[in-house]
């Protein structure tokens, strides 16, 4: 079973809350989050309640301040534990909305979408197998978007504010 511990202050200080399952609203348990310990599994953290806002994908480890998980601020209001996946990863990305335009199939990590495919924008995608993370910038930097199996007809379906995707990687156990 997964476990994550949220701390109000940096360096694992202050009031804390232990969580072992999805939680749509963390605000009753702490007012701010400045450090986190992930004791097991992968977790997706959200800036707002009900799995909305900026997303941060964390694996087992210690994060003594929010910059360590690429956070923009100390606001974490909901979280999801990622279930274990198989060893198969497959996704189709499209240069236009609703699966239009050029299609590329991906089965491995991509540190630079532009270097590999010669375009920066992904307007829609189909995740067939595995869990993935889209990053706003190359080399796995910037805003993160958690991608589970399913169809995403436009970038707003995965929570994106624009169609720009700089890199993407598989979530591997």
Curated annotation (Swiss-Prot):
UniProt entry keywords in alphabetical sequence: Eye lens protein, Repeat
Signal peptide span: none
Residue ranges annotated for the Beta/gamma crystallin 'Greek key' domain, each copy included: 2-40, 41-83, 89-129, 130-172
Record-level GO BP terms: lens development in camera-type eye; visual perception
UniProt region (Connecting peptide), positions on chain: 84-88
Coiled coil, from the record: none
SUPFAM superfamilies reported in the protein's UniProt record: gamma-Crystallin-like
Record note on domains: Has a two-domain beta-structure, folded into four very similar Greek key motifs.
Reported function: Crystallins are the dominant structural components of the vertebrate eye lens.
Family classification: Belongs to the beta/gamma-crystallin family.
The protein's name in its UniProt record: Gamma-crystallin S-1
Annotated source species: Chiloscyllium indicum (Slender bamboo shark)
Protein encoded by which gene: GS-1
């Amino acid at each position: 079973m997964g476990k994550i511990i949220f701390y109000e202050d940096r360096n694992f200080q202050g009031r804390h809350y232990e969580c072992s399952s999805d939680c749509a609203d963390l605000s009753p348990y702490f007012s701010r989050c400045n450090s986190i310990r992930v004791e097991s599994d992968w977790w997706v953290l959200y800036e707002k309640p009900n799995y909305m806002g900026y997303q941060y994908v964390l694996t087992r480890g210690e994060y003594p301040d929010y910059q360590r998980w690429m956070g923009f601020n100390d606001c974490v209001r909901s979280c999801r534990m990622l279930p274990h996946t198989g060893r198969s990863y497959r996704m189709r990305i499209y240069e236009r909305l609703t699966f239009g335009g050029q299609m590329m199939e991906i089965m491995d990590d991509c540190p630079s979408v532009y270097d590999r495919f010669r375009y920066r924008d992904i307007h829609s995608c189909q995740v067939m197998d595995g869990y993935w993370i889209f990053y706003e910038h190359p080399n796995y930097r910037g805003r993160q978007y958690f991608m589970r199996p399913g169809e995403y007809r436009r970038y707003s379906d995965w929570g994106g504010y624009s169609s720009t995707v700089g890199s993407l990687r598989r979530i591997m156990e």
